[in-house]
Amino acid sequence: MTRYFLGVSQEEFPPEALLEQAVAAEQAGFDGISSSDHLQPWWEPGESGHTWPWLGAAGAATAKVPFGTGVTSTGARYHPALIAQAWVTLERMFPGRPFLGIGSGEALNEVPVGDDWPSVGDQIARMDEALSIMDRLWKGETLTEEGRFYTCTDLKLHTLSERRPPLWISAFGPKAAEVAARWGDGLWTLPDPESTPSLLEGWRDAGGSGDVIFQALFSWAPDADEALETVRKWKGAQPQEHYKEDWHEPRKMYAHGEEQMSDEEFERSAIIASDPGEIVARIRELEELGPTVIVLQNNSGPHALEAIELFGREVLPALRGA
């Protein structure tokens, strides 16, 4: 049976509001909570709370639900040791609950701290190297090495956990899917009826197994037009070049997204609705592609808490056949 996680957006809401959403999500019956990990939003003005301290607060404010990053990037912001250390810290405080989503990142979050944004091939190679470092640190190894992207000198984790993280790796193409197969317990992607089947086939052919995680934006409001206007700013996150190339200025990214994507295209790629039945139908379409987890990213603006309550009252019971 598919599990349904709430995705909370550090780019859109202040951290205290997201904490309310996390508590409401557990009460509504969501199966987990996924937090974005951004230095900057995709537009201005936006938000940019730090996901790692927020996750500690979310773990303390909730009782049982799994929680983690969706996703953390392997770039200039974080040496892999910091990611490995942060995850172990959460696991020691909330055993059995944290997961870790990993991706190759965006220039949006790396260039402002001094990264020279690499080619797509090097983005993936850097993620591969970072995952190798984290894997060995979680095993208790001490590392001294000069890699292509990271340096380690007598590096080890002095606090370890019994459990390794459920590691879900973001992939949109065959090279990243191979990395996900090599290191991950699942593949995280944005569902697309045309490209997702071949992506999953390539991942499995490379030895990948485990969870298939789909992430989807949703915006609910009492009026469908309001739901669209509320989520419109997320067009800045849609163009593929914003991930592949050096786009790092939020205002320009939003303007470019608005130019590149019509409202009709956006409504096909995101779940934008006032009718809970339409939301259920759209999620059912995603399920036809075979996910085990769907992360429903709540971009409902001023109606965010109402949307979570609606999911608990109508959407999740319908999806589960209650």
Question: What are the functions of these language-model segments?
Answer:
Residues 1-322:
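Active-site-adjacent structural elements that line small-molecule/cofactor binding pockets in enzymes
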